[in-house]
Amino acid sequence: MSLRLTNTLTRRTEPFTPLKDGHVSIYCCGVTVYDLCHLGHARSYIAWDVLRRYLIWRGYTVTFVQNFTDIDDKILKRAAEKECSMQEISEQNIEAFHQDMDSLGILRPDRMPRATQCLDGIRSLIGELEASGAAYSVDGDVYFAVMKHHGYGKLSGRDLNEQQQNADGRVADAEEARKQHSFDFALWKGAKSGEPSFPSPWGAGRPGWHIECSAMVREELGETIDIHLGGADLIFPHHENEIAQSEAATGKQLARYWLHNGMVNVGGQKMSKSLGNFTTIRALLENGVSPMTLRLFILQAHYRKPLDFTADAINAAATGWKGLNAALGLGNIYSETLNWPECKPLPQGVIQAAHPSNQEQCNKIRQHFIDALDDDLNSSGAIAVLFDLARPLRALANRLKRGDTKAIQETAKLNLLPRWQLLVELANVLGLEAEKAAQPAPERNNRVDENHIQRAIATRKEAKAARDFAKADLIRDELRAQGIELIDKPGGLTDWISS
């Protein structure tokens, strides 16, 4: 069986065939850099990191491009709040993004263009759309004429005529009144007083969000790419609009495969900054959740399915990782005792191509692993293979840790070295690598005062009921500083985890 991927565009799980044999071009929508990344971002970028690692492992040459949106209303708002420039906010959060992704073992993209660095390509693309009649300008703004693009809605399945009927009777604001159609969207926004702006044929202003990605895809990878990635929340309007812009300009298909990951849910709601129910990657790591525990937690669910963030789920992942980590570290810690050659870690960003073992059993296990990931990146199935592979290795590690000398003689008969080498190889495809012994947790977290936490949770609940969200956020931040992370659940309940 070859790799099969669920294509949002066709709504089918299809065999993957790249445009150019042996080469794969991938574009992934990046973050708007106004704040720290939360667990939802980790879910997305870990899923796509595994896709990239797997393709490389299977022998493909992969070009992976991921953008930064470094000019946006949210960035401007945050800059005003902090009384600093848009550039300062962007630079701070780009650096924080790299730190978070590096901590999680996510390979850095081959190229990471920024919107402000691609303005020539953006202006050129808008000009082409206007010249073809697919866009129109109004007093310094430029809009895409949705009704001129007959394929609009093919990704999301939305019927514009039906939605227009449902929208009839709405009171239009000033911008809506300027549009030819309510679903038309901005390609270029005229300058506003006090905001950064850039020159253009339509006057000073800045690009719309959607046009940025279309321009960067074309500039970095060409007019048609193999795979376009993003979260399910981007299907409409962002990715729908990307398709409309790009295909109206080039007359060619933008991407052959569209993959979308499911959301992280907290208390039955999508984790998001707008809802205030998010937990940053940094907070989780600082509070003692290991990077590999987070990877395992995320990969135990299929990338397209919703992922529920609960204390129980994190604790279960931590337990699972403890055993897997013991097996992965076996050959490094006990290489001399077992007379095994030391397994040196691969350089950052290096993925070895798959290589068959001289053991038939190992080759069967490798094939089970391949079968799982070939099935639309079934990471939970691949992890199950790792746990089966690790079982005797974990048992050996535990015996050696207890000083059981008989284990060495028995191991020689079992010939576990190829099994361990295979475990390290396959785990690397999922970005799972043995961690060094964890440092002791800060003293503040050694004793958890549960009564104090419950009182704080009760006070926070009262504050939220009174719509005093500032106080509720303050309580959450104070507990976070003490190493306690709150997790809101359905029914107004709140769980917590501690490092």
From Swiss-Prot:
Pfam families: DALR_2 (PF09190), tRNA-synt_1e (PF01406). Zn(2+) binds at residues 29, 213, 238, 242. A motif ('KMSKS' region) lies at residues 270-274. Monomer. Binds 1 zinc ion per subunit. PANTHER family: CYSTEINE--TRNA LIGASE, CYTOPLASMIC, CYSTEINYL-TRNA SYNTHETASE. It catalyses: tRNA(Cys) + L-cysteine + ATP = L-cysteinyl-tRNA(Cys) + AMP + diphosphate. Belongs to the class-I aminoacyl-tRNA synthetase family. This is Cysteine--tRNA ligase. It comes from the Bacteria. One of its GO terms (biological process) is cysteinyl-tRNA aminoacylation. Its EC number is 6.1.1.16. GO terms for molecular function: ATP binding; cysteine-tRNA ligase activity; zinc ion binding. InterPro entries: Cys-tRNA-ligase (IPR015803), Cys-tRNA-synt_Ia_DALR (IPR015273), Cys-tRNA/MSH_ligase (IPR024909), Rossmann-like_a/b/a_fold (IPR014729), tRNA-synt_1_cat_dom (IPR032678), tRNAsynth_Ia_anticodon-bd (IPR009080). It comes from Prochlorococcus marinus (strain MIT 9313). It is found in: Cytoplasm. The lineage of its organism: Bacteria, Bacillati, Cyanobacteriota, Cyanophyceae, Synechococcales.
